[in-house]
Amino acid sequence: MQINKLYDDVYEIKDFLSKEEFDAVNYIINNTPEKDWFDEESKKKNNIPDFWYGKYLHFETENIFTTINTKMKNLFDSYSYYPDKLSLSRYKKGDFITQHTDQWIPDLPYYIGYGFCLYYNDNYEGGELEYPDLNITVKPKANTLYIHGGHILHGSLPVLDDRIRYFSTVFIHGTDESPTILNKELFK
């Protein structure tokens, strides 16, 4: 695992997953039927917004994404809440997410300390990750985790071809009593 600091509160971790973990994710990507991406029951149960319908795969049972989620959680010394499930997301041709910060809901009893985005493939055109206020635009490589502070403006550019971009995101919460603090040994 190689950690690169791109800017204050923006990190890139190459080769985040082991070969076995990476292969297990790709097995799910390559063997999930298209109909599973459009599960109405899961949409209702997990409050999946229309924007994410067909782009979001939620798992009810433990699998490789449980292992990955634990690995991500271990990058912290402190936090108030860390989600117990990790999902698989995808963007098809034309899909993107507009520039935003992860701390977008006012008056919450917590803040989003960090957002994580782990990329599983890089064989698509477009789909770059951008941090416009920092003048950073990157084409994420497969098996690379990006970490950014919840206050940092970011977004993605549209996927330009018919190859699908696969990734997982997670948001880590903090409070005044339990702030989000990255592992001091890893993030020096």
Segments from the language model and where they lie:
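Non-heme Fe(II)/2-oxoglutarate
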Residues: 1-80, 87
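Catalytic core of Fe(II)/2-oxoglutarate
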Residues: 112, 125-188
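Short, conserved beta-strand element in jelly-roll/cupin
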Residues: 90-91, 107-125, 171-172
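A short glycine-rich, His/Asp/Glu-containing loop-to-beta-strand
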Residues: 81-95
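Short beta-strand segments enriched in hydrophobic/aromatic residues
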Residues: 17, 29, 103, 120, ...
